[in-house]
Amino acid sequence: PAWLSLLIAPFVVLNVIVGLVTYITLLERKFAARMQSRVGPYRVGPHGLLQPIADALKLMMKEDIVPAAADRPVYNLAPIVFLVPCMLIFATIPFAPGLGVADLNIGILFFLAVSSMEIVGLFMAGWGSNNKYALLSTMRAVNQIISYDLPFIFAALVPVLLAGSLKLSDIALAQKGLWFIFYPVIGQLAFIMFVVATLAAENRVPFDILEAESELVAGFRVEYSGMKFAIIQLGEYAHIIGSSFLGALLFMGAWAGPGPEALGPVWFLDRKSTRLNSSH
């Protein structure tokens, strides 16, 4: 039936993203361990490969504690409000020619608009927790998002002007001859601006003021535990992956590469990983 075919693509994309998030967290922990002369997660499964699954089960079974002074409706709703925009950004990303959920004519505008909506859930989490550290973290987040939004838009505007389209698939196809990152001066400047703005959007070093461990502990999520904490983590890493996909699509030719078109998603994932490493 027609309604079933409309659900298949979102279902597949969501499951792929959840799988990527699961093992990117493991990869990050492994990298951090190596940098500190440690082994990292190693006990669950061969070489610790099943550690993310064990962590997910642990979070699902943990008690859901709500602070006595919290604003319960806001506190409980915040993780979902935070997660939805982080997942919705994948709706317009084409992973290969004709392979995606919805290739909109205003794809880049949709991505920019939806990705900025995560601040609503983030602010709800800080406000609803009724915790001074969480609230201070959300206030910093609002200031930071106001700061990075304009550079992010200006950086994304360069590929849009070079391709002459807001449609993400058109931007990818316009790079068949030359990736936009290799355009003299303007391509490199736009890419550097995009990376810096994305680091700020993802709250990564040196823009991790939202959860500065030395003063704010876990930032806006300090009062969350169990499944709610897992949902917030899922949204945060999904946003990182989505921004990495967008960077590969805007500047690195997306799925264009040697070999048959069937290898397009492989090249796209490879460039996404390159962009992801720059975020860490």
Task: Please report, for each region that a protein language model flagged, where it lies by residue.
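Membrane-interface helix starts
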Residues: V39-G45, K62-L77, A238-H239
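Conserved small/polar residues in nucleotide/adenosyl-binding loops
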Residues: T274-H280
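Alpha-helical transmembrane segments
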Residues: A9-I17, N105-S116, F180-L199, P265-K272
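Juxtamembrane/interfacial segments at transmembrane-helix boundaries in multi-pass membrane proteins
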Residues: P1, P97-F110, F154-A190, E261
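Mid-bilayer segments of alpha-helical transmembrane spans in multi-pass integral membrane proteins
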Residues: V84-A91, F110-A125, I146-G164
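Transmembrane alpha-helix boundary signature
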Residues: E63-A68, M87-V101, F123-W127
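N-terminal cationic and glycine-rich segments that engage phosphates or anionic surfaces
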Residues: F90, S169-G226, A230-E236
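Juxtamembrane inter-helical linkers in multi-pass membrane proteins
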Residues: A33-A56, A141, I145, R204-F229
